[in-house]
Amino acid sequence: MFQISNLLLAADFSSEVANNSAVGMIGSFIAAALLIVIPATAFLIFVSQKDSLNRTSTGRR
């Protein structure tokens, strides 16, 4: 582990590069949530509610 940290320090990464990378990663997570997770969740909730209504209405007949 010590050798890896020395290698990273010797590579002369700046904190600005690391900060920009972290901001980009967080932005990617937020974009993925907005584009994939939230619409998929909304769709699944809609379908499950619709199915629940269909099952309760057919059960009363």
Curated annotation (Swiss-Prot):
Q: Where is it mainly found?
A: membrane
Reading the lineage from the top rank, the first entry is Bacteria
A GO CC annotation recorded here is: plasma membrane-derived thylakoid membrane
Q: How does it sit in the membrane?
A: Single-pass membrane protein
Q: Where in the cell is it found?
A: Cellular thylakoid membrane
Keyword Thylakoid on entry: yes
Task: Please tell me whether the keyword Repressor is annotated for this protein.
Answer: no
Q: Which UniProt keywords apply?
A: Membrane, Photosynthesis, Photosystem II, Thylakoid, Transmembrane, Transmembrane helix
The portions of this protein that span the membrane are 26-46
Q: How does it assemble?
A: PSII consists of a core antenna complex that captures photons, and an electron transfer chain that converts photonic excitation into a charge separation. PSII forms dimeric complexes.
Q: Family, per the entry?
A: Belongs to the PsbX family. Type 2 subfamily.
Q: What's its job?
A: Involved in the binding and/or turnover of quinones at the Q(B) site of Photosystem II.
Name by which UniProt lists this protein: Photosystem II reaction center X protein
